[in-house]
Amino acid sequence: SGGGGAGLAAAVQANQLGSKVLVLEKMGKVGGNTILAGGALNAVNDRSEQAIAYNDSVEWHYTQTLSGGDYQGDPLLVHTLVSNAWDGVQWLMDLGMEFQDETAGLFTVTGGLWPRAHKPVEPLGTGFFKAYMNYIDSHDNVDVMLNTRATEILVDENGKACGVMATGETGNTVTVKASKGVVVATGGFAANVELRSAYNTQWADLGDSIKSTNHAGATGDGIKMLQKLGADFVQMGNIQLLPLGDPMTGSLSGNIEHDVETRIFINKEGNRFVNEGGRRDDMTNALFAQTDAYMWIVMDSDTYPTGDERNNFGETANQLVEAGRAVKADTLEELAEKMNVPADTLIAAVTGFNPH
């Protein structure tokens, strides 16, 4: 159950391996959180010129991923993830998904720690779903039911999952029998304030004041179903906060697109206060420590030479400026005035960063 990135990827591969598959999706369309994500996919091709140039490798990806999670991850699972990541990219390309050429598209995604992110040609996560749905629409024995909320995992007398109970669009009961098992791919719960607050062990507050980048359907339905069966959960308190986005809505819309290497974070005093290429939790904690937990993201015309370049939501930098969601200036002094920060500290921050 679940028609997001994980659910549809599982459905496609299960069908490729010979299984008859039905995906249940409670929303009116597929996509989940994946379609709202930036779309970048971290993977190392050991033989590529880019990986060699950046001194990257699968083992380095493994080391960074394990240490970046404070060694709480299962080493075997982490190694499985990173060692199969490039095969995953190739699998997606075989399905028809397009990625930018590595020389133009390999970059460091926020919190990614190294330039190994592959950027799709299509915006956000739309490229994934075009590939998945093109496959599903052109193959037998794999279907998607929309507006169908899974409510219970059915088990046989031996405790094996044998189907799913669901509620259809009109409130009707839908029973699906499964001979080979049930894949639960509907566990995201960032849009469920009660659930995330209950599991939270890391942050001071994850209540209503903290908005979510997730879609409205990320309410942890799969977790609730598995709880009824006595499933064992691990590390549920490791909830990620992203140091970006609209604090009023949580949306990433309105952000000027930027690479880790070409931006600096500036607080209300005009100071750069954190390594923008670091871990997401480190950046978020640093942001919370600033006045009003407020920052500007500063970049120059090397990133936006004309102002007509579009972000993942189709918005140009000029449009964001016109809407009052961004400012631009020809000099740092003028920019400081528009940001309402001291010019001398902003100039010092920019000149201190530029040699890097």
Where are these regions (language model features)?
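Glycine-rich FAD pyrophosphate-binding loop
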Residues: 15-37
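A short alpha-helix-loop-beta-strand transition element characteristic
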Residues: 72-77, 91-105, 232-235, 274
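An anion/pyrophosphate-binding glycine-rich loop and adjacent beta-alpha core
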Residues: 219, 223-225, 231-341, 345
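N-terminal Rossmann-like FAD-binding beta1-loop-alpha1 element of flavoenzymes
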Residues: 1-23
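Glycine-rich active-site loop/strand segments that organize a redox cofactor
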Residues: 43-81
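Conserved redox-cofactor binding core of oxidoreductases
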Residues: 83-174, 192-195, 246, 356
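Glycine-rich loop(s) and the adjacent beta-strand/alpha-helix scaffold that form part
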Residues: 169-245
